[in-house]
């Protein structure tokens, strides 16, 4: 029997995050609630008074101060719940934090409509006044939203439903992380393996095809049993987005989602169109994988296993730490020292435990350390995940230490750039040190997986989302059957005829949590393409590349994301960044074919 995961209480504290930069303990967190409640109650005192620059500045300053405290409060509760999603006390904390946030959203809902209801000439003079200089960009973004902001009464009504409208995502998350269990699976030797959310991909990477097949079937059997529930939650998420877009006078839910970041829909469509033009390269990859694995048929449970037998090298966490440090050395001494600080100050929650939230992420607030959740298992993917999340955390640190609170939060469009640059630096650094053909093929395989998983796969997700929301907007039913068909057809399009499409594949859409953040996934693909350009510039020692990149990381949310990327040297007004990235994918395939000749 394979080793089972530990309970949270049995984990070594040195490998658990230290949340004390948020709150020292749960008691201190609880004691923060009365002050938050009192501050929220003061917000309506400004209602009817936001008609001059001085009062608006005072209101913005108060809201910024409150927002920092509220962020700490919510973040701590959320991270505590991630430690063990079965912990009823932590569940209650997050629920309370969400209630407080809902109360805040309701209390402040009058502000934007009130400011935007001012006469045009009065509003113009306020926007350009010296009093509001620290909030100039925020005011510009607010003006951009003017046609879509409702009356104060309507905004208050929507805000009151914040917690309710977030239910589909919470239900899906709870079902997957806390309630769903999977049948244990056997390998080719009859050994039994526990199967859960954290180790599924690890089992799919096994060289034992029997284990891969059994894990694949057991995993998606679990999703099939709940597929109608997942369809209902996803339908709720889509209907919420579509309804809000309609009442806010947007052309579509996608237009609403993209408007805040000032990204035109043509960027989204250009991504899909350009990736589809490079489909032959993905089909080439699938054929190469089939050939290298020596299979008559390539199935979906064969797409994660390493291309080279015996190449599943394992790393300790300490080795992973050093590998990440070596990889980011081109970014300079200050960057390296901050990564060391992250290790020393326990920003990272390292290992899986029973009930721990699946996946990986970086979190934190303006006043706290950044925090990283991961489930390290010793694979190259696990090492890469640390590099990835450290990229997020360093982006957050630089933004928070450069920008004011109101300008520190970078948008989702640029959020994945820093993380992917770190991943690429890691692989390139390892390739540079490796001449042995098998090891080199393992690294090239990892690189290819990055392109497959982040450019092709996320673009496929983007198509799925675009089509699912469009179906709802046309009045078509969002059901398990319709989502299964849509997803299965996209798998066929993106992977081609050389991949056997097993029935279980059609349920995969149900396990993608990012679908509950509408039109987020395409940003993984655009970010990856931007990161390819930036990492190549850094490694090629292009003049000013590191300086411009670190400036980009320090910009936070002080400019629109397309402008920030343009400052760093990436222009998404053309298809060039996507074409350039997929040309790199083709070159890596060439490298694999050449390396194979040396075996």
Segments the model singles out, each with a brief description of its role:
Residues 1-310, 595-598:
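A well-structured
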Residues 10-11, 111, 115-118, 126, ...:
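C-terminal, non-catalytic "cap/extension" segments appended to globular domains
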Residues 249, 377-397, 419, 424, ...:
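Active-site recognition of the HExxH zinc-binding catalytic motif
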Residues 292-330, 336, 344, 371, ...:
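Long, K/E/R/D-enriched contiguous segments that form extended
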Residues 310-315, 348-368:
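Catalytic zinc-binding patch centered on the HExxH motif and its immediate surroundings
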Residues 312-317, 365-387:
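Short pre-active-site segment immediately N-terminal to the catalytic Zn-binding motif
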Residues 326, 330-337, 363, 392, ...:
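Conserved helix-loop functional segments at active or binding sites
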Residues 410-438, 447-449, 453, 527:
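Post-HExxH zinc-binding segment in Zn-dependent metallohydrolases
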């Amino acid at each position: 029997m394979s080793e089972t995961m530990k309970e949270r209480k049995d984990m070594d504290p040195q490998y658990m995050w230290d949340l004390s930069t948020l709150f020292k303990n749960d008691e201190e967190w609880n004691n923060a609630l009365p002050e938050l409640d009192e501050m929220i109650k003061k917000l309506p005192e400004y209602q009817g008074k936001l008609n001059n620059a001085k009062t608006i500045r005072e209101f913005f300053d108060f809201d910024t101060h409150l927002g920092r405290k509220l962020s700490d409060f919510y973040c701590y509760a959320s991270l505590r719940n991630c430690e063990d999603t079965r912990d009823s006390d932590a569940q209650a904390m997050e629920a309370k934090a969400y209630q407080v946030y809902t109360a805040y959203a309701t209390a402040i809902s009058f502000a934007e409509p009130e400011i935007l209801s001012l006469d045009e000439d009065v509003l113009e003079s306020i926007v350009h006044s010296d009093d509001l200089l620290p909030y100039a960009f925020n005011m510009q973004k607010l003006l951009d939203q003017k046609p879509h902001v409702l009356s104060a009464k309507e905004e208050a009504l929507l805000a009151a439903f914040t917690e309710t409208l977030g239910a589909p995502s919470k239900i899906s998350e709870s079902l997957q992380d806390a309630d769903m269990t999977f049948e244990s699976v056997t390998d080719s030797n009859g050994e039994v393996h526990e199967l859960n959310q954290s180790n599924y991909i690890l089992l799919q990477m096994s060289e034992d095809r029997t284990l891969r097949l059994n894990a694949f079937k057991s995993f998606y059997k679990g999703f099939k049993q709940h597929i109608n529930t997942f369809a209902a939650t996803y339908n709720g998420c889509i209907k919420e987005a579509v309804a809000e877009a309609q009442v806010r006078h947007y052309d579509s839910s996608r237009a609403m989602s993209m408007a805040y970041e000032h990204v035109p829909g043509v960027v989204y469509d250009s991504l899909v169109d350009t990736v589809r033009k490079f489909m032959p390269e993905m089909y080439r990859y699938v054929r190469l994988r089939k050939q290298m694995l020596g299979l008559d048929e390539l199935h979906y449970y064969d797409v994660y296993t390493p291309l080279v037998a015996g190449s599943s090298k394992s790393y300790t966490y300490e080795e992973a730490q050093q590998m990440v440090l070596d990889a980011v050395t081109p970014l300079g001494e200050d960057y390296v020292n901050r990564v060391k600080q992250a290790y020393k100050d326990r920003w990272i929650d390292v290992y899986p435990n029973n009930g721990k939230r699946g996946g990986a992420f970086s979190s934190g607030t303006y006043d706290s350390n950044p925090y990283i959740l991961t489930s390290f298992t010793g694979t190259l993917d696990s090492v890469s995940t640390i590099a990835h999340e450290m990229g997020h955390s360093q982006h957050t640190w630089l933004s928070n230490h450069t920008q004011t609170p109101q300008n520190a939060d970078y948008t989702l469009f640029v959020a994945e750039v820093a993380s992917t640059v770190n991943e690429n630096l890691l692989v390139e650094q390892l390739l540079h040190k490796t001449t042995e053909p098998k090891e080199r093929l393992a690294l090239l395989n990892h690189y290819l997986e990055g392109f497959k998983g982040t450019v092709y796969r996320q673009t496929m997700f983007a198509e799925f989302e675009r089509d699912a929301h469009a179906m709802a907007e046309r009045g078509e039913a969002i059901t398990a059957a319709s989502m299964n068909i849509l997803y299965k057809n996209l798998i066929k399009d993106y992977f081609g005829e050389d991949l056997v499409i097993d029935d279980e594949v059609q349920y995969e859409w149900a396990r993608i949590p990012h679908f509950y953040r509408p039109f987020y996934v395409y940003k993984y693909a655009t970010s990856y393409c931007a990161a390819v350009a930036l990492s190549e510039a850094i490694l090629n020692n292009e003049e000013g590349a590191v300086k411009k990149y670190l400036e980009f990381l320090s910009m936070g949310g002080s400019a629109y994301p397309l402008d920030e990327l343009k400052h760093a040297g990436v222009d998404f007004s053309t298809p060039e960044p996507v074409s350039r990235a997929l040309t790199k994918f083709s070159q890596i395939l060439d490298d694999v074919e050449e390396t194979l000749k040396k075996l």
